[in-house]
Design a protein with these regions (language model features):
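Nucleotide-sugar donor phosphate/pyrophosphate-binding loop at the beta->alpha transition
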Residues: 8-15
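Non-catalytic C-terminal accessory region of glycerolipid acyltransferases
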Residues: 31-150
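A conserved, positively charged/aromatic
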Residues: 18-19
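Short acidic-hydrophobic, aromatic-tinged amphipathic segments that line or gate anion-handling sites
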Residues: 24-28
Length: 150
């Protein structure tokens, strides 16, 4: 998913590049979760940005000792569809790009869906923090992530 808030020409280039390598890119809109749910139920691999809240309606998590907002989408999709939720972190090395996958984050047995999504999203943040501390230069963040730091 991506936001088409980019200038039209830049968004088209972004879209064209990803589609040429076999990706289906979904714009962020009201049908996105329904489309993603259908793809998940049909066994498709879905990659979602999980370290930045583009919707401004994210879940508050503890990240490096400060409150940050992460998107609810990855955990919500897993709760609603039963799809496996895995984290991935990209590291750039002299020998190329390495992608580190974490073990599955399971849907908690207890709590309502909102509590389950919050707990799973905090686990995503915890795993991301662990990798971020190893190689902070590999994190490309252009948005404000910690509101309390000004």
């Amino acid at each position: 998913m991506c936001s088409s808030d980019l200038p039209e020409k830049l968004f088209r280039k972004f879209l064209e590049y990803r589609e040429n390598i076999g990706m289906e890119v979904l714009d962020l809109n009201s049908r996105s979760i329904a489309t993603l749910s259908q793809r998940a139920r049909s066994g498709k691999l879905i990659a979602l940005v999980a370290d930045r809240d583009l919707s401004k309606n994210g879940i508050e998590v503890d990240l490096c000792g400060h409150i940050a907002k992460f998107p609810a989408g990855p955990a919500l999709l897993a709760v609603q569809t039963g799809a496996a939720l895995l984290t991935a972190y990209i590291r750039y090395t002299n020998s190329g790009i390495h992608i580190i996958f974490g073990p599955e984050i399971f849907v908690p047995e207890n709590g309502d869906n909102q509590a389950k999504v919050a707990k799973m999203t905090q686990e995503i943040a915890k795993r991301f923090e662990r990798e971020l501390k190893k190689d902070p230069v590999d994190w490309h963040m252009l948005q404000r992530i910690w509101p309390d730091l000004g």
